[in-house]
């Protein structure tokens, strides 16, 4: 009997070891100096580097990436065209990162936001290029001030082979653009939600992550939940993301300014915050209250897209949502969106922890 019990225990331990994996690594600047207190995550677990820039983390079989929450004053370094803020988890047990110190202080910075470029055909790229060059011209007026961009999803319209050309056209902006995953960025006709992120992750890395600029903590989430049938989805944050967000925010001082970017809006009206309507299941987030609760200790702004209209909602005294108009408007059919708002981009000026637009 003892031998049987020992065998069972050994098998169970082996099974656990297959799922769990201990990894380590470093976060250094471009001169090779280790950076202390940098947050590193696998999309669930979150740790900080020690005084020498070293980290150790237990990860599991569901984790696909390890990434750095880029600290304020730094940007993700690029080596031979590879962005170094994330790495795909594999057989290696060591993952080293490099971040590059910015030339200027980023306490005051600018954020340019676009939503739903939704390029469905290569013939639409000239239209996108007009906007990209316009953004580039605006950036030049900032006279070297810190600025970066965010795309709130639906980068393309189902045809993910267009991603490389999209990236090329957006380079005309002259700035780094972080990306959010949209429902049109999903890999469809699979049987699991996790598989719906395949194409996006292959091009842009993790579908949820965080970074810091100045005094602001930025969070990117994926609330396009694939239900395992055709291309159908709902607005929903899965348990893993909510657990990760709680772990991530544990390193952010209470009262800080937090900007959350996602694709499907959490709310479009006061009424949808009071009661849930099944007809809206693909237009607003079903479990928004869980997100609101995590953001309660902070001064927060949520940025969303998806609707191709403009909408601002004051959710609480310390929480607002801006639903940003689509860059493609009514799918590149004219100069306005579905509600008549002009197509274009939104500009946010961040002065310390204060946001104006």
Language model features with spans:
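Extended active-site neighborhood of metal-dependent phosphoesterases/phosphodiesterases
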Residues: 72-77, 85, 160-254, 277-301, ...
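Short acidic, glycine-rich surface-loop motifs adjacent to enzyme active sites
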Residues: 249-275
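N-terminal active-site segment of His-dependent metallophosphoesterases
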Residues: 22, 70-164
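A short, solvent-exposed beta-strand micro-motif common in secreted/extracellular proteins
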Residues: 46, 61-78
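Short Pro-Gly-centered beta-turn/loop motif in secreted/extracellular proteins
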Residues: 33-35, 56-65
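Short, acidic Ser/Thr/Gly-rich low-complexity loop/linker segments typical of extracellular
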Residues: 44-58
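Hydrophobic beta-strand segments
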Residues: 38-42, 65-66
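Structural motif
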Residues: 21-36
């Amino acid at each position: 009997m003892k031998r049987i019990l020992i065998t069972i225990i050994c098998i169970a331990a082996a099974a656990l070891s297959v799922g769990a994996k201990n990894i380590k690594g470093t976060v250094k600047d471009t001169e090779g100096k280790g950076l202390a207190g940098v947050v590193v995550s696998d999309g669930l677990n979150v740790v900080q580097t020690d005084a020498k820039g070293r980290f150790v983390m237990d990860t599991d079989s569901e984790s696909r990436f390890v990434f750095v929450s880029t600290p304020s004053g730094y940007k993700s370094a690029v080596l031979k065209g590879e962005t170094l803020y994330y790495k795909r988890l594999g057989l290696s047990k060591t993952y080293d990162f490099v971040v590059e110190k910015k030339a200027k202080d980023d306490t005051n910075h600018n954020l340019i936001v676009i939503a739903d470029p939704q390029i469905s055909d290569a013939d639409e790229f000239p239209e996108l290029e007009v906007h990209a060059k316009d953004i580039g011209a605006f950036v030049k007026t900032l006279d070297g001030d810190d600025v970066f961009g965010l795309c709130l999803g639906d980068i393309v319209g189902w045809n993910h082979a267009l991603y490389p050309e999209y990236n090329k056209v957006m380079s005309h902006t002259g700035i780094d653009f972080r990306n959010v995953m949209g429902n049109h960025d999903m890999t469809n006709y699979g049987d699991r939600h996790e598989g719906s992120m395949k194409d996006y992750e292959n091009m842009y890395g993790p579908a949820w992550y965080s970074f810091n600029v100045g005094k602001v903590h930025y969070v990117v989430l994926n609330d396009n939940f694939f239900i395992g049938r055709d291309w159908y989805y709902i607005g929903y944050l899965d348990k893993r993301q909510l657990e990760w967000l709680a772990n991530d925010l544990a390193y952010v001082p209470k009262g800080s300014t937090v900007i959350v970017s996602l694709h499907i809006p959490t709310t479009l009206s006061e009424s949808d915050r009071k009661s849930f309507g099944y007809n809206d299941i693909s237009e607003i987030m079903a479990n928004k209250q869980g997100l609101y609760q995590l953001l309660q200790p902070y001064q927060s702004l949520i940025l969303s897209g998806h609707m191709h209209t403009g909408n601002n909602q004051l959710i609480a005294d310390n929480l607002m949502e801006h639903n940003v108009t689509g860059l493609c408007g009514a799918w590149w059919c004219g100069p306005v969106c579905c509600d008549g708002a002009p197509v274009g981009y939104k500009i946010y000026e961040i002065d310390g922890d204060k946001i104006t637009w």
